[in-house]
Amino acid sequence: MPGGRRGPSRQQLSRSALPSLQTLVGGGCGNGTGLRNRNGSAIGLPVPPITALITPGPVRHCQIPDLPVDGSLLFEFLFFIYLLVALFIQYINIYKTVWWYPYNHPASCTSLNFHLIDYHLAAFITVMLARRLVWALISEATKAGAASMIHYMVLISARLVLLTLCGWVLCWTLVNLFRSHSVLNLLFLGYPFGVYVPLCCFHQDSRAHLLLTDYNYVVQHEAVEESASTVGGLAKSKDFLSLLLESLKEQFNNATPIPTHSCPLSPDLIRNEVECLKADFNHRIKEVLFNSLFSAYYVAFLPLCFVKSTQYYDMRWSCEHLIMVWINAFVMLTTQLLPSKYCDLLHKSAAHLGKWQKLEHGSYSNAPQHIWSENTIWPQGVLVRHSRCLYRAMGPYNVAVPSDVSHARFYFLFHRPLRLLNLLILIEGSVVFYQLYSLLRSEKWNHTLSMALILFCNYYVLFKLLRDRIVLGRAYSYPLNSYELKAN
């Protein structure tokens, strides 16, 4: 009616008359603002925090069976045998002969040109490849303990003899290599250690190292701050020699024990657990990468550096063998250092951490939004603002920092417990199928022999991966109600 007062439209009614979810769950606790009228003034309503009205459901974990894992000594022995077989195959690829020719050719009397092989180099490579096995023997003997003084003296003597023998062989081979080769070739002998020290030992996370010494993770926030404040002094006190000795010692140490998951209740403790697990995972991956590259370097690349210029060999096949050795060593070390129990631990921690999805500005403008708080456990679907950006909670339990990329990466990698295992099966299965294809297409005797020997080693690794995948796949697909559920 002209001149009369118009009633409010539907849009105005929906915005002013109905309280928003932000008012119902955010309120005056820092998670949102109060109800506002059209003039923008806040109406003071006593509103409880979001955690009092929307409580996320408890995180429930599946119980997986204890799958058999090779012991440290057994794995190092099998890994050493595999590397010796790969080294033998590489020497066949380099020094093979046409031994079926008539005997009037001097080089065709044997299948290999044994007179061209540098046995000092082969002995040096063998000692370098056996370093982990030797240290595993010493560690297992030390763990066994001594029942008597005689037993203790025998253990000490055996350890001394073993280390002395390895050191003597190493020095003897180095002296002979110095006499018969140029300085440029000799630089290749210690190249992996020269690369490892500057890349790895100067980038150690001292705070993570301090926190990882105790694996119960249930620490007070004050202790965390105190340990973080002492990081600077500890990092500065380390000189180059101590870092060098520490980094070299890590190459002989066995894998660190698997930590335990404590289902912490506090968001700070959850994030602290994730930081510790992230540092431990990065350390294990660093060891896997270095040891796999170290093995491939000494097995397949170093023999090529000492080949005489007059010696002909198939460069493509030798480089292909180098890649295969590295991939197989990577899968074997990953399977040993990242077992199914450890991956399940990372999955449980990722379930507590949660994930945030970044949204565009202007989207969800009419939906309730909250200010992110580090002391709040956010349920799924909640919109929060953090660092001038809008995020939506994706997991059922969210305590991650929205702007922290490492938290999002951690959740992406481990919120599905079989992701890493499926990746290893895909890599190893592709290698096995390619080697079978190459075996069927091979026409040279050294190609057939090398593929046949390597395939036997790969079958064992693929069998273990498929066994774990079948068992864990059924365990994780089982209904949660059938387990004895563990909730926080």
UniProtKB/Swiss-Prot annotation:
Disulfide bridge map: none
Transmembrane region(s): 72-92, 110-130, 154-174, 182-202, 287-307, 319-339, 420-440, 446-466
An example Gene Ontology CC term for this record: endoplasmic reticulum membrane
UniProt entry tagged with the keyword Cell membrane: no
Tissue specificity field: Up-regulated in brain tumor glioblastoma multiforme cells (at protein level).
Record's subcellular location: Endoplasmic reticulum membrane
A biological process term (GO) from this entry: negative regulation of autophagosome assembly
InterPro entries tied to this protein: Uncharacterised_TMEM39
Domain of life (superkingdom): Eukaryota
Bilayer disposition of the protein: Multi-pass membrane protein
Role: Regulates autophagy by controlling the spatial distribution and levels of the intracellular phosphatidylinositol 4-phosphate (PtdIns(4)P) pools. Modulates (PtdIns(4)P) levels by regulating the ER-to-Golgi trafficking of the phosphatidylinositide phosphatase SACM1L.
Assembly and oligomerization: Interacts with SACM1L, SEC23A and SEC24A. (Microbial infection) Interacts with encephalomyocarditis virus (EMCV) major capsid proteins VP1 and VP2.
PANTHER family cross-referenced by the UniProt entry: FI21814P1 (PTHR12995), TRANSMEMBRANE PROTEIN 39A (PTHR12995:SF3)
Protein's recorded name: Transmembrane protein 39A
